[in-house]
C-alpha cells in the first residue's frame, strides 16, 4: 500500500512540471506516473461494438475465451466447430465476413441516450472499441480504407456516420471522461500479413496518432499486443509521442498491453489489466474488465441466467474496489445501435446503489484488509488475471461447509467503510478498535450504535428492520475511525 501511495504522490509531483520530457524507453516513460483521476474514479463502462455485432454469436462456455462473440471472424477462419456450424447454417458456407459490413447499419444509434444510461450507471469514464482485431474503425480512418482496399470504417462504410465522434461528444456533454480501446494488430489485414514492420510504421502509427489528435482520449486501452514484443511494435516511441507531443499529455491514462512482454510491468506508466480475473496486487494501479455476461461483444446466444444479476454486479464493483482496483464493466450493443434493455437495466441498478453508497467507492483506497471472513475454511482463490472463474457474489454467499465474506472494507482518509452484503442485526468487526465511535448507515436517518467488546467492535443494527435499509448491500460508515 505504501508503494501505491508513493505512485499517486509521485504522479502529482510529475504533473507539476510541464517541462518533463520522456525518452523512448520504459525507464524514462515510467517516471511519468499515472494521472490521479483514474484511481479515484473507480468505475468505467467498456463498449465492444463492431461488425461482429451483426452475427453476435458465440457458444456459451463459462471461463473460456471461446465465449467471446467479438472473435467471430477469427473463429470461423480457424474452423472452430461451434462458430463454423452456426455460420454455415445461418449465412452459408460461402458467406464472407466482409459481407457483414452492409448489415452494420447502426440505424437506431442515439448517442445521447447511451450517454444518459452511462451517467445514470454511476460510471465516471467510458471506453469504446475504436477498432477491434477485425480492423474495422468506428471513425473515419483513411489507413483502414487504404490498406484493406475497401470501405472499412463507419464513415465511408454503411453507417455513413462518425459513430466514435458522436458518442464522444455525448459522453463528454454528460460530464464523463471518454477513452478508446485500440487493437495494435488486425488479424487479416493484408499489410499485417505481408509486412509487419510496414504495418506498424505506415498503418498503426499514423492511425493511432490520428485517433488521439482528433478525439483526445482520457484512456487508451491497447490490446492485441501479444503477437510481437514492444520493440517490434515500436511502442516506446509511440508512447514517447503520446506523453510529450500529443494533445493529451497530462490527462491520458494507458494500460499495460504494448507488447508480448509488457503485461504487469511498467507500473509507473501503465495500469495493470485483469480480464474476468481474480484481481491484482493492491500495491499497483489495476483494472478488472468483464462483461455482464460471458462475452464482451453482444452474444444473442446468451440467456437470462448467463447474465450477472444486478446484485452480483454491485458486489463485483465492491470487491474490486475493496482490493484497490477499478472496474471496467462491458456492454455489447446490437448492430442496430441499441443497448440491450437487460444491460441498461443492470447499469441503472448499479447507479441507484451508487447514488446512496458512492461515498464508499469513489476516491477510496484499499484498507489493510479487503474482507472479513466468517469462521471456517476459506475457499481457495486462484490469483489468475484471466478467466479465473472468480465470483464476489459466490464468496459472499453464506454457506455451512466453508467460510464466506461477511464484510468488505474501503477507506477514505480517516473514515472506514464496512460494506455488508445482506441485512444482519449485528455487525462485528474482529480485531478492530476505532479511534472514534461515530457510526451511521449511508442513506439512512436511523440511529445505530457501536461499542467495543474485547478486541472486536460491534455495531448494533437492531433499530432497523431489513426493509428499512435503503440498499442491499448496505454501508456502515465509521467516521474518524482510523
Provide a role label for each language-model segment.
Residues 20-482:
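Mature catalytic domains of secreted/periplasmic carbohydrate-active enzymes
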Residues 1-20:
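Bacterial Sec-dependent N-terminal signal peptides
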Amino acid at each position: 500500500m505504501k508503494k501505491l501511495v508513493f505512485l499517486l504522490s509521485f504522479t502529482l509531483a510529475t504533473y507539476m512540471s510541464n517541462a518533463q520530457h520522456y525518452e523512448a524507453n520504459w525507464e524514462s516513460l515510467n517516471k511519468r506516473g499515472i494521472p490521479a483521476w483514474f484511481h479515484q474514479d473507480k468505475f468505467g463502462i467498456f463498449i465492444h461494438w463492431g461488425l461482429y455485432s451483426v452475427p453476435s454469436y458465440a457458444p456459451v462456455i463459462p471461463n473460456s475465451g471461446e465465449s467471446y462473440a467479438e472473435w467471430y471472424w477469427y473463429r470461423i477462419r480457424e474452423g472452430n466447430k461451434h462458430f463454423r456450424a452456426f455460420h454455415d447454417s445461418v449465412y452459408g458456407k460461402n458467406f464472407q465476413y466482409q459481407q457483414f459490413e452492409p448489415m452494420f447499419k447502426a440505424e437506431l444509434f442515439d448517442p445521447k441516450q447511451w450517454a444518459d444510461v452511462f451517467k445514470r450507471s454511476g460510471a465516471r469514464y467510458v471506453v469504446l472499441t475504436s477498432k477491434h482485431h477485425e480492423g474495422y474503425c468506428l471513425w473515419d480512418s483513411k489507413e483502414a480504407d487504404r490498406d484493406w482496399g475497401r470501405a472499412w470504417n463507419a464513415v465511408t462504410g454503411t453507417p455513413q456516420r462518425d459513430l466514435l465522434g458522436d458518442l464522444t461528444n455525448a459522453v463528454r456533454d454528460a460530464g464523463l471522461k471518454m477513452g478508446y480501446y485500440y487493437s495494435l494488430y488486425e488479424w487479416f489485414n493484408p499489410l499485417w500479413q505481408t509486412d509487419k514492420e510496414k504495418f506498424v510504421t505506415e498503418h498503426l502509427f499514423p492511425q493511432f496518432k490520428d485517433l488521439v489528435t482528433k478525439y483526445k482520449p482520457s484512456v487508451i486501452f491497447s490490446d492485441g499486443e501479444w503477437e510481437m514484443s514492444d520493440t517490434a511494435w515500436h511502442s516506446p516511441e509511440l508512447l514517447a509521442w503520446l506523453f510529450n507531443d500529443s494533445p493529451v499529455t497530462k490527462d491520458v491514462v494507458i494500460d499495460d498491453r504494448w507488447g508480448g512482454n509488457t503485461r504487469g510491468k511498467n507500473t509507473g506508466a501503465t495500469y495493470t489489466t485483469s480480464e474476468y480475473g481474480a484481481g491484482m496486487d493492491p500495491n499497483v494501479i489495476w483494472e478488472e474488465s468483464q462483461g455482464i455476461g460471458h462475452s464482451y461483444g453482444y452474444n444473442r446466444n446468451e440467456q437470462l441466467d448467463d447474465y450477472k444479476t444486478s446484485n452480483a454486479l454491485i458486489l463485483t464493483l465492491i470487491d474490486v474496489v475493496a482490493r484497490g482496483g477499478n472496474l471496467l464493466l462491458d456492454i455489447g450493443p446490437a448492430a442496430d445501435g441499441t443497448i440491450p434493455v437487460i444491460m441498461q437495466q443492470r447499469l441503472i441498478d448499479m447507479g441507484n446503489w451508487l447514488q446512496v453508497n458512492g461515498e464508499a467507492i469513489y476516491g477510496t483506497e484499499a484498507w489493510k484488509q479487503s474482507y472479513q471472513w466468517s469462521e471456517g475454511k476459506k475457499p481457495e482463490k486462484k490469483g489468475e488475471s484471466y478467466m479465473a472463474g472468480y465470483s464476489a457474489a459466490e464468496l459472499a454467499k453464506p454457506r455451512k461447509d466453508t467460510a464466506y465474506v461477511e464484510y468488505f472494507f474501503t477507506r477514505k482518509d480517516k473514515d472506514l467503510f464496512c460494506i455488508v452484503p445482506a441485512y444482519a442485526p449485528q455487525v462485528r468487526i474482529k480485531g478492530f478498535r476505532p479511534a472514534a465511535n461515530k457510526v451511521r448507515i449511508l442513506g439512512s436517518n436511523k440511529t445505530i450504535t457501536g461499542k467495543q467488546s474485547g478486541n472486536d467492535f460491534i455495531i448494533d443494527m437492531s433499530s432497523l428492520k431489513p426493509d428499512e435499509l435503503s440498499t442491499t448491500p448496505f454501508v456502515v460508515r465509521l467516521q474518524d475511525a482510523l
